């Protein structure tokens, strides 16, 4: 189930570092972003797992490409009236998840191009990186392709973790 992330004008290097790590953990195929703020923030080296070596990360002028995105289902993730609560959402097979900036919202014109709009039903708005993590976890939790053995644990845990459940 291909996953692509689109971040509109990301601001915080810490958020982008967390988003990169989440993209690696949840096996996203690509991350695209608009704006110039992240290019300046990259100097802070927040990609501690070097995810950018495995996942295509690219700057784009337009968050939705009318030519290449025709096979992707576009999903805006935003606190928008009329949006579907994430717990009730069925994730499409090939998805482009679009997230707004930390200090703004997704423009109406972009929302209008999306097949779905979802929101996370919390009290107050969430941090951008937290929103990406929750959405990606929700997608994983609703899939039938989850591993059920210890192999994923052994491959994912920190090198100092050798703890076992009884």
Task: Identify what each model region corresponds to.
Residues 14-15, 84, 105-106, 126-127:
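Residues that form or flank phosphate/diphosphate-binding pockets in enzymes
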Residues 17-18, 109, 130-131:
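Generic recognition of short, well-ordered alpha-helical segments
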Residues 62-67, 82-83, 125-127:
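A short acidic, often aromatic-flanked loop/helix-cap motif at beta-alpha or helix-coil junctions
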Residues 36-38, 101-104, 121-126:
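Short, acidic/turn-prone active-site loops that include or flank metal/cofactor-
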Residues 80-118:
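Active-site/ligand-binding-proximal alpha/beta "capping" segment
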Residues 25, 113-151:
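Structured adenosyl-cofactor binding patch, chiefly the S-adenosyl-L-methionine
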Residues 42-46, 87-89, 130-131:
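Short secondary-structure transition/capping segments
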Residues 1-78, 140-166:
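RNA substrate-binding interface of SAM-dependent RNA methyltransferases
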């Amino acid at each position: 189930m291909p996953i692509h992330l689109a971040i509109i004008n990301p601001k915080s290097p810490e958020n982008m570092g967390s988003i990169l790590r989440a993209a690696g953990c949840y096996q996203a195929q690509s991350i695209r972003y608009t704006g110039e703020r992240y290019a300046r923030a990259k100097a802070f080296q927040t990609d501690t797992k070097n995810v950018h070596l495995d996942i295509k990360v690219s700057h784009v002028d337009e968050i939705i490409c009318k030519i290449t995105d025709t096979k992707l289902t576009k999903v805006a993730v935003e606190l928008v009236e009329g949006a579907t609560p994430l717990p009730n959402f069925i994730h499409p097979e090939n998805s482009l998840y679009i997230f707004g900036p930390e200090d703004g919202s997704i423009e109406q014109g972009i929302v209008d191009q999306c097949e779905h709009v979802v929101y996370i039903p919390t009290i107050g708005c969430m941090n951008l990186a937290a929103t990406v993590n929750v959405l990606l976890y929700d997608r994983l939790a609703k899939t039938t392709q989850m591993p059920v053995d210890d192999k994923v644990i052994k491959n994912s845990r920190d090198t100092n973790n050798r703890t076992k459940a009884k």
